[in-house]
UniProtKB/Swiss-Prot annotation:
Part of the 50S ribosomal subunit. HAMAP family: Ribosomal_uL15. GO terms for molecular function: rRNA binding; structural constituent of ribosome. This is Large ribosomal subunit protein uL15. Keywords: Ribonucleoprotein, Ribosomal protein, RNA-binding, rRNA-binding. The keyword RNA-binding applies. Pfam families: Ribosomal_L27A (PF00828). Residues 1-54 are annotated as: Disordered. GO terms for cellular component: cytosolic large ribosomal subunit.
Length: 143
């Protein structure tokens, strides 16, 4: 067998039905669209989700919750991330330059996730109670 000799199975492919080409074809005149009505017109169809004037599902259901616009300014850093950085002093600028937090971040908080063995001094960065205890246990401090 060769790639240029591969062909589809017999009867697997058929020509597209040409509509609107005379009554002898069986699909002339109305071209399978029936008589009159919105769906028979060119360009005539309803928008997605339209239910014939009934209140559509996406408007029947209530809105729920909200998304805070302040999230992009807040960031969190784990203890394991601080461990990987290997810096003695960590501040917002150091985290941004290392690519740990986004450039828009204004507030950073350390959360207790992972282990910390190196002493790290945090400048202008908050920490949860558990993270603070872990940092101090490793010989670090918060300023």
């Amino acid at each position: 067998m060769e790639l240029n000799s591969i062909k589809p199975a017999e009867g697997a492919k058929h020509a597209k039905r040409r509509v609107g080409r005379g009554i002898g074809s069986g699909l002339g005149k109305t071209a399978g669209r029936g008589h009159k009505g919105q769906k028979s017109r060119s360009g005539g169809y309803h928008k997605v989700g339209f239910e014939g004037g009934q209140m559509p599902l996406q408007r029947r259901l209530p809105k729920r919750g909200f998304k805070s616009h302040l999230l992009k300014f807040n960031a969190e850093v784990t203890l394991s991330t601080l461990e990987q950085l290997g810096l003695a002093e960590v501040d917002l600028a150091a985290l941004k330059s290392a690519g740990v937090v986004g450039q828009l971040a204004k507030v950073v908080k350390v959360i207790k996730s992972g282990e910390l063995t190196k002493a790290v001094k945090l400048n202008g960065i908050g920490a949860t109670a558990g993270a603070k205890a872990a940092i101090e246990a490793a010989g670090g401090s918060l300023a």
